[in-house]
UniProtKB/Swiss-Prot annotation:
GO terms for molecular function: RNA binding. Monomer or homodimer; in equilibrium, with a preference for the monomer. Dimerization may be employed to package NusB in an inactive form until recruitment into antitermination complexes. Involved in transcription antitermination. Required for transcription of ribosomal RNA (rRNA) genes. Binds specifically to the boxA antiterminator sequence of the ribosomal RNA (rrn) operons. InterPro entries: NusB-like_sf (IPR035926), NusB_fam (IPR011605), NusB_RsmB_TIM44 (IPR006027). Belongs to the NusB family. GO terms for cellular component: cytosol. GO terms for biological process: DNA-templated transcription termination; transcription antitermination. Pfam families: NusB. Keywords: RNA-binding, Transcription, Transcription antitermination, Transcription regulation. It comes from Thermotoga maritima (strain ATCC 43589 / DSM 3109 / JCM 10099 / NBRC 100826 / MSB8). This is Transcription antitermination protein NusB.
Length: 142
């Protein structure tokens, strides 16, 4: 069974993924289409906060991810890998109460489920390096 937080992350991932193919539409509106009555109030609030945070910090998030792509550009990544990395990088940097290991494990699970057979390992490698060098110090104590 999926936890409310896992379902929330999946909703955010799905909104980011769909936005890649629906660029003319507002990302927040796409999220609202995904959030139905099966999501509780907190999950909806969290998902909206994540989407706002990702939108507001997208350039910085993308630049940070790009620093760790060896012989790749962000645009060459699969849509799945790119958006899993965006979601998890946001969570690593801005969601102070979520342990690093939880963020990375959840991202790996989404990548494995929706990506290629190599997506989980790829996402793990990038996020591990981002976490070690950029996650707030207090997250290492959670």
């Amino acid at each position: 069974m999926k936890t409310p937080r896992r379902r929330m992350r999946l909703a955010v991932f799905k909104a980011l993924f769909q936005h890649e193919f629906r660029r003319d539409e507002d990302l927040e509106q796409i999220l609202e289409e995904i959030l139905d009555e099966t999501y509780d109030k907190k999950a909806k609030e969290d998902a909206r906060r994540y989407i706002r945070g990702i939108k507001e910090n997208l350039s910085m998030i993308d630049d940070l991810i790009s620093r760790y792509l060896e012989k790749w550009s962000l645009n060459r990544l699969s849509v799945v890998d790119r958006n899993v990395l965006r979601l998890a990088t946001y969570e690593l940097l801005f969601e102070k109460d979520i342990p690093i290991e939880v963020t990375i494990d959840e991202a790996i699970e989404i990548a494995k489920r929706y990506g290629t057979e190599n997506s989980g390992k790829f996402v793990n490698g990038i996020l591990d390096r981002i976490a070690k060098e950029h996650a707030p110090k207090e997250k290492f104590e959670l």
